[in-house]
Structures are given as structure tokens and as C-alpha cells.
């Protein structure tokens, strides 16, 4: 074959490869996304906020694609118009009036038309604080149909829901921002990590959960922490456990250098002050504080190999301080959990963390003061900030922004 012919073939191959690449870079409509998760949700009612951190993270992610709020936070955490196009106040600044977005259709086919095309809220707080609270998914607009069905305005609607087991979301063809790329989302709930990994390997799933600390993402969205649920431990014993933990070794060996060591509930990128919550390991001081400590039952997810190894290491560290933490069934004294950071607004994120901790919370405090109050008494001991982990099939694009997810070539 002549050299010119070879050059022509090479050029043609490169051209067609470029065309294919450009075509693949354009989102395509259609297809079903198959999602498996560990969380088991009873419903998507925004009024029912779960205290279980796994369920809280899943519900906070799914609610906004079915139900929408008057405002939403952008990538920088700033409130932006959503179902409300604008807002104003009365002369006394005691009442705020929100103008409803026109031409918004509910999932049941009816138009969303609030009385006088506006909604009012009596509230004399600064508008910035009101907007940030309204942006929480738990403050979504929900319409109750006569049969009790909850109807929203989001880019997806619920086509089928089996509490705690499975669900199907289908595209809202009449969404005011245009329909999503996917035709539907099939969700399997309550799946353990082993089954999820097997389904991903066999091509039965597109999105699954993965063990903690396996993501290389730089931005951290979850906080690994110890939570004390019973009164068996005193503040001194809880502080002793905090002082006994060798976070440097855990991060280097068990987390393979991933994540950030921190004693704050919120990551540095969100709050800007997490470095203020800092203390050094002090086993000698921990032994003094731990004198007379009773044995504590300790719970963590044994299906997650990384979480299990961290739990075992924490028990060893506590033993060095003279505290016994042994695995227990049922209601444990101590839990090792991943607490989700559900919002780009500090106070909104802390409010949801307070739900996980089952602790009262004041939305009017400054973020630092609110976080300091949650940390007082060592009822929660933050350990690491880690990225949220998923396994994705090769055909998934734009995850986890579900309204913009599309199916490409594997």
C-alpha cells in the first residue's frame, strides 16, 4: 500500500473518531438509570425528615428532583429564584411576599397557582436567613391530592413506590425548565454493599454505593464521626475517647491518605473555620479522664470493610486509654457513622446534622456558635471529612446532578 493511502486512512480514522467524540459530548435524551442504595426510604414526603444519616443523605438527594422549593442555593451557596421569581417586604419588614413563578404545572396535570399568584410569610428575620431556610429540601412545595397522594413540580414524578424496597421515577414532560434527559430512574433500596458490587459487576446497576474513603474527589461531602446515643458515658469519658484516637495513623494506613482529619462537623471549604476545632492526641490525659469508665457497646457497618477496620482501630485506641468499646446489638452506646453535609449553607447543613444527633438547634445563631454548641459535651466526635462515594457504570454522564444525568456510550 502506498504511503499516501496510509496517510489518508489515518486521517479519515482520526476524523471519524473526532466526530464520534463530539457526538458523545452532547447529552442525549432517553434511557433508564438503574440506581441501588443502602438507604431504605419509606417515602419522599419532605415533612418527614429521617434521623438516620444514611436515609437522610439519600432523601435529601431525591426530594429536590420530585418536589421543589421557592428558592435554591447555587454552587456558591447563594439563594436563587426557583418556584418564586422575586420577593419583597411590607413597610414594617414584618412580612415577606414571594411572587410565584407562572406556568408551572404539577405532576397531576393541574397548574400550580397560589392565591393571588404570591405567597406570604410573617417573619421579621433578615431576608438572607429566610431564603436559606426556605431553600432546604424539607421546605419544598407539596400539594395533597384528594386521595392523599403527594404531588410536586420537579423534573421527575413518582410512578411507583414500594416503601423501603423499590421506586420508579419518570420524567416530567411538562417541567417548567424542560424535561430531564432520562426517561426514568429505577431505584432499589436497602441493598447491602456486597450485592450492590455484584450487580455493578454483572451490569445490572448503573449507580451503587461504595465503601468509604475510596473516592479521589477533593471536595468532602460527609463527616465520619462517633455519636453517643445513651447516657452511659460521661462527658469526661467521651473526651477521653476523643483524645485517645490516632487519626494520623487511621488516615495514612486505613484511608490510604484520603480525606481530611478534622474535629469540626463542617468541612473547611464550606465553613472556613474548621481549623479552629483542633486538638492533639493525648493518651496520658485520656487515661486520667477515663478512670471508672463502664464498658460501652459500639456499633458500625460491618459490611463496609474500611469502616469495619476503622471501628476496630478505634476500639484499640480506646483500650489504650482504659476504655472498653465492644461490638453490640440493638441500641449501642456509641455509633461510628457517616454524617452527610446536605447543604452548601452552613446553618442548613448544621440543622440536618442536629437531626442526626437528635439535638435541639437554633437557626438564628451564627454558624460557628451553632457548631460549637453541637460539639459541646462530646456527644459527637468528628474524625474525618470524606468525599461521598459511588460506583458508576461507564455509560453514566453528569452524576450526581440527576435532572442533567444522561446515558452515553459504554
Map each language-model feature to its residues:
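Structural transition elements
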Residues: 236, 256, 260-292, 302-309
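Long beta-strand-rich cores associated with HINT superfamily self-processing modules
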Residues: 157, 390-410
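Surface-exposed binding/hinge segments that line
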Residues: 28, 95, 99, 108-149, ...
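Ligand-site clamp/hinge motif
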Residues: 173-217, 221
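Periplasmic-binding protein-like
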Residues: 231-270, 310, 366-379
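N-terminal lobe/hinge region of extracytoplasmic solute-binding protein
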Residues: 36-91, 151
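Ligand/substrate-recognition segments at binding pockets and active sites
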Residues: 289-342
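Gly/Pro-rich hinge or "lid" segments in bacterial periplasmic/extracellular proteins
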Residues: 133-180, 184, 191-195, 284
Amino acid at each position: 500500500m502506498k504511503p499516501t493511502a496510509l496517510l489518508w486512512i489515518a486521517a479519515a480514522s482520526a476524523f471519524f473518531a473526532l466526530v464520534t467524540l463530539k457526538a458523545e459530548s452532547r447529552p442525549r435524551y432517553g434511557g433508564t438509570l438503574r440506581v441501588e442504595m443502602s438507604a431504605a426510604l419509606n417515602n419522599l414526603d419532605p415533612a418527614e425528615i429521617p434521623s438516620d444519616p444514611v436515609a437522610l443523605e439519600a432523601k435529601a438527594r431525591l426530594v429536590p428532583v420530585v418536589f421543589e422549593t421557592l428558592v435554591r442555593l447555587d454552587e456558591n451557596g447563594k439563594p436563587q429564584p426557583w418556584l418564586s421569581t422575586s420577593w419583597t417586604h411590607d413597610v414594617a419588614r414584618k412580612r415577606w411576599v414571594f411572587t410565584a413563578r407562572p406556568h408551572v404545572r404539577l405532576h397531576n396535570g393541574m397548574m400550580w397557582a397560589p392565591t393571588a399568584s404570591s405567597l406570604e410569610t410573617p417573619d421579621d428575620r433578615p431576608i438572607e436567613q429566610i431564603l436559606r431556610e426556605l431553600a432546604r429540601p424539607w421546605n419544598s412545595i407539596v400539594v395533597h391530592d384528594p386521595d392523599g397522594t403527594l404531588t410536586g413540580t420537579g423534573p421527575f414524578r413518582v410512578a411507583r413506590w414500594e416503601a423501603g424496597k423499590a421506586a420508579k421515577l419518570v420524567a416530567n414532560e411538562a417541567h417548567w425548565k424542560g424535561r430531564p434527559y432520562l426517561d426514568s430512574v429505577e431505584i432499589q433500596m436497602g441493598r447491602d454493599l456486597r450485592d450492590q458490587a455484584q450487580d455493578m459487576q454483572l451490569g445490572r446497576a448503573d449507580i451503587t454505593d461504595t465503601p468509604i474513603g475510596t473516592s479521589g474527589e477533593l471536595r468532602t461531602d460527609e463527616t465520619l464521626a462517633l455519636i453517643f446515643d445513651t447516657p452511659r458515658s460521661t462527658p469526661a469519658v467521651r473526651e477521653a475517647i476523643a483524645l485517645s484516637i490516632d487519626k494520623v495513623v487511621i488516615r495514612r494506613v486505613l484511608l490510604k491518605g484520603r480525606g481530611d482529619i478534622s474535629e469540626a462537623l463542617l468541612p473547611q471549604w464550606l465553613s472556613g473555620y474548621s481549623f479552629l476545632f483542633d486538638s492533639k492526641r493525648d493518651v496520658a490525659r485520656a487515661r486520667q479522664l477515663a478512670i471508672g469508665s463502664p464498658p460501652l457497646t459500639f456499633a458500625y457497618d460491618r459490611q463496609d470493610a474500611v469502616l469495619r477496620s476503622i471501628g476496630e482501630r478505634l476500639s484499640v485506641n480506646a483500650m489504650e486509654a482504659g476504655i472498653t468499646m465492644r461490638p453490640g446489638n440493638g441500641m449501642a452506646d456509641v455509633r461510628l457513622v457517616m454524617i452527610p453535609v446536605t447543604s452548601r449553607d452552613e446553618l442548613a447543613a448544621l440543622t440536618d446534622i442536629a437531626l442526626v444527633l437528635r439535638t435541639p438547634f437554633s437557626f438564628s445563631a451564627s454558624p460557628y456558635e451553632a457548631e460549637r454548641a453541637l460539639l459541646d459535651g462530646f456527644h459527637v466526635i468528628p474524625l474525618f471529612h470524606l468525599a461521598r462515594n459511588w460506583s458508576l457504570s461507564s455509560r453514566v454522564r453528569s452524576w450526581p446532578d440527576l435532572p442533567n444525568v444522561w446515558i452515553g456510550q459504554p
